[in-house]
Amino acid sequence: MLSLDLVFSFPAWALLLVLTLLYTLYLATTRLLLSPIRHIPGPTLAALSFWPEFYYDVVQRGQYFRQIDKMHQTYGPLVRINPFEIHIQDPSFYPVLYTGPTRRRHKWLWAARMFGNNTSAFATVRHEHHRLRRSALNPLFSKSAIQRLTPHLQHTLARLCSRLDGFAFTRQDVDLGIGLTAFAADVITEYCFGQSLELIGKDNFGKEWIDMVSAPSELGHLVKQCPWILVVCKWAPKALVRALLPGVALLFQIQERMSAQIQPLVDRAAAVDKPADPLTVFDFLLSSTLPQHEKTVDRLKGEGQTLIGAGTLTTGNALKTIIFHVLNDPDIFRKLRAEVDGALENMDILSMSDTAYLERLPYLSACIKEGLRISYGVTHRLQLIAEEPLIYSGVTIPAGTPVGMTSIFMHDNPVVFPQPREFRPERWFEADFETVQAMNRHFVPFSKGSRMCLGMNLAYAEIYLVLAVLFRRYEISLSGVTREDIEMAHDFFDPAPKEGARGLIVQLQKRG
């Protein structure tokens, strides 16, 4: 009784201070003294707390990758960047971490939940569960499947060209970056649902929808740190959520749209005993051998959110980056135009059976690889957990430790890619064989291993077709755009330019 009286006689602020000190002591003991990764070098504050990452990624908006780079400059290639995670900045370790299906690699739940869904193959934590979900999707994005999709890509690209012809006729500036992102969105939505969004025909290429799809990318930093926010917001009045956390409101809006798109497909699949040949991604999944609990609307809406986001934003950004750098260097533009004109004379690109011929054009291919390298693909570190201890440079990384690597540091490595921030397509065919092989090993815009990007073949097909058609069909010039309007300034999982960036504004003129 006396002890309780003593506690309640304390001022509230004093009690709070004591509890805070005790909690800090507990964290210091468990995270600094008892942690299985206490031997990994790194800043003490980062080992003690997630606050540094919160500050740089949430408050400063996607800047923690810069701090990680500074940590590596201070502590070396192996760094502890938060209480539980290690980051490695050494290209030679990439195939060890991002390995094939024979080595079990799990995702880290703390990171996997950043987009507010855990039902997509991308966000699946356990290795076996991911393999189940991914195996159902793989046939849809194989090289042969994308070849069969070529007429659909050409039809959508023809619609984009028809729209761009109007800008060419009026000599009006056009945001080609948004137009190309709309093209990618129309392609992936029609492939997923059998119905395109028709963004190409909308005012401003449906930029509002593209902004909505982009919103969860930046929001992911906050959700990762504070997952309870989504739970609270689901119960809060929608008007309040829109006012206080518009990114959360947009995320919920995307998820509602995914449910609305998928529900009719689920109903249709349930209504027939023997479905016809599947026409869309979700028709295929619903007719697959996946267990029934993997075919619910709640499960598949997460798959839809991931496929639409990845299939829209990363392809659009890659195209925007490549076209800017080609136009920004007259010599590169001249070489690419000469190759495309010479190789495709008297050929109709929009009626080719596939992109194999385009893929054999050396300078076009080099421009694409260099653009993918310099735009990074996904810019956020991709953490995986190995079941076995990993050894790096004689240091043991305990089993069960989240380990991440980042495409930015892979692609900007000056040893592998001299003058890494220069857009230089020639590096891919002028170097000797061993150097090119080394560059290929460290070229990871789609990551590698069993969890590499599902849509790589689709992205390549879109990029080859778009570049060949645009540079054959139009004279294109930049309209007051600088590299800062294109280049990554924020890591929102996907790369994002600086606030107020103009984008890829161009003028078009149809060639004779």
From Swiss-Prot:
Heme binds at C453. The keyword Manganese does not apply. It is a single-pass membrane protein. Its cofactor is heme. It holds the Pfam family p450. One of its GO terms (cellular component) is membrane. It is an enzyme of class 1 (oxidoreductase). GO terms for biological process: secondary metabolite biosynthetic process. The chain crosses the membrane at residues 6-26. InterPro entries: Cyt_P450, Cyt_P450_CS, Cyt_P450_E_grp-I, Cyt_P450_sf, Cytochrome_P450_monoxygenase. Its main location: membrane. Pathway: Pigment biosynthesis. N-acetyltryptophan 6-hydroxylase; part of the pathway that mediates the biosynthesis of the gray-brown conidiophore pigment. The first step of the pathway is performed by the nonribosomal peptide synthetase ivoA that catalyzes ATP-dependent unidirectional stereoinversion of L-tryptophan to D-tryptophan with complete conversion. While the stereoinversion is catalyzed by the epimerization (E) domain of ivoA, the terminal condensation (C) domain stereoselectively hydrolyzes D-tryptophanyl-S-phosphopantetheine thioester and thus represents a non-canonical C domain function. Belongs to the cytochrome P450 family. This is N-acetyltryptophan 6-hydroxylase ivoC.
